[in-house]
Amino acid sequence: MKVLVIGSGGREHALLWKLAHSPSVKEVYVIPGNDGMTDVAHLIPVKGTEDILDFARLMEVDLTVAGPETVLTEGLADKFAEKGMAFFGPSAAAAQIEGSKSFAKNLMKKYKIPTAAYETFTDEEKAVSYIKKRKKYPLVIKADGLASGKGVVIAETEEQAVQAVRGMLEGKTFGSAGESVVIEEFMEGEEASVLCFTDGNTIVPMISAQDHKRISDGDMGANTGGMGAYAPAPVMTKELDKIVYDTILLPAVKAMKKEGCPFKGCLYAGLMITKDGPQVVEFNCRFGDPETEAILPLLESDLAKIMLACTKGTLKKERVEWKNACAVDIVLASEGYPATHSSGEEIVGLEEAKKTGCLVFHAGSMKKKGRYFVNGGRVLNVAAVAPTLKEARDKAYEGCLLYTSPSPRDRG
């Protein structure tokens, strides 16, 4: 099987690595990729939907996999479907479950999927008036559209809430993503991520994970795209796994089918485990980053076969098995991230980190004359697998300590 992955980050490197080790795969390509991925895939320097389609057709690619959400909300899956080519990922209509917070919240309300109470606004003054009537804080303000995982403000005061709403609706904070805002109640509890494979009917949950979005230890500092993750999430018990399947995953997939936009691909449920049970914080239409870098090292089955089955509607025939182990992924980010980031510093110690048994996935790096340099905010992911979370964490940090550049930032 020939497989093509779309994307260029750590998540895509993890997907490429796992697909390259699939017994059914003989060739792996990535568009556009990054220089750190050449150990497992051929980098293809093409741009634009038509060029991607032409390449897949020319090379007789058997399966194309989307990494980032933007290509899905823009309809890449639909273009492949029109050409009769297998594509792992939802249609543009189904990708609304991530592309529009209001779509997702309205879907959950209609089909009684547990989530926080909310209101949606496009009018700034109406939103401010609603906020001024609220007595309970914190309050969660979300940009309706895509904002690279950073479009959420947890307002501790009325002043912060008003400032967040004005910034979004005036287009200053998140551009067109903030043309509509969702204001919802703050949920207390512990977060967990449950991803699943689905062909639109059958659902196969993956091992649960927990990611950490704050830039600093102690869950402090600015929100980021994700600074680390581990799997499985300790908060998730077998009982909770079943509750999540029965009350969230299954109803969501059934709801999408009833709405005329069946979901095929990876459905990601970001959860808050509250005193009243699991509640949905958000749905994503693709693999999480950095959760993927912690989840995929635990998968024992052939990833390419699972994905292809999702495109064909035959997922129920596949056996999906997982290691009885734990994984921890730590993100190494450049100085200034997430507000800005440095670039150009040399990355040293990659081979030493790999010798510890750690996996190294590249995100924001580039290669010049055989040496790697920083070229983004989140630069590298160092992942480790071990019998316990503590052992996996210690092993991952051992790998991180062997990496050096003038200004690395990490947390786990």
Where does each model-flagged region fall?
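ATP-binding N-terminal substructure of ATP-dependent carboxylate-amine bond-forming enzymes
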Residues: 1-92
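Active-site nucleotide/adenylate-binding loops and adjacent lid/helix of ATP-dependent enzymes
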Residues: 4-5, 99-180, 234-250
